[in-house]
């Protein structure tokens, strides 16, 4: 994902990272583009195919984005479908998750995957409460549209690697 000042060079880097990581998750690909509104493009295709789609070009490339979240899914719980592809949006939370939970987070939302239960749980009761319930592996990136914040959380069982651009204006 990227958060901050996203120019053409960084957008190209985001697409390259998404494409290079597609071997880690071949069941579906998705991108959330967050600027003045949230646009999510996802499908049961490889990253290269999603990046070539008219929907991606219209909803992602044509907008000025503050945050880009990308994900390639390897299905562990829940069927392979467009709805079960990441990113997820529940209320103010836009989220991607790497890992597997042994049981879903308790939530009022109707969810089909462990990842979507994390998203709904954070939206309903906050990340601290969700993390107390966490049973499994989880690294989560999420954007809170109400607070305008980008958040990274991990229980250490899945990798979380990040860096800043040289000008310190963008988190990668």
Residue ranges and their predicted role:
Residues 1-172:
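Conserved short alpha-helical segments that host acidic/polar catalytic motifs at enzyme active sites
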């Amino acid at each position: 994902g990227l958060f901050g000042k996203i120019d053409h060079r960084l957008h190209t880097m985001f697409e390259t990272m998404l494409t290079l990581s597609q071997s880690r998750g071949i069941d579906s690909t998705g991108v959330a583009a967050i600027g003045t509104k949230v646009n999510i493009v996802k499908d049961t295709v490889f990253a290269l195919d999603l990046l070539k789609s008219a929907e991606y070009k219209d909803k992602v490339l044509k907008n000025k984005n503050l945050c880009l979240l990308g994900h390639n899914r390897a299905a562990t719980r829940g069927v392979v479908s467009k709805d079960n592809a990441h990113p997820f949006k529940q209320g103010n939370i836009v989220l991607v998750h790497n890992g597997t939970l042994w049981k879903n987070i308790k939530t009022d939302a109707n969810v089909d995957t462990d990842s979507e239960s994390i998203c709904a749980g954070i939206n309903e009761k906050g990340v601290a409460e969700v993390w107390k319930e966490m049973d499994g592996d989880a690294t989560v990136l999420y954007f809170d549209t109400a607070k305008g914040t980008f958040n990274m959380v991990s229980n250490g069982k899945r990798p979380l690697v990040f860096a800043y651009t040289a000008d310190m204006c963008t988190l990668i």
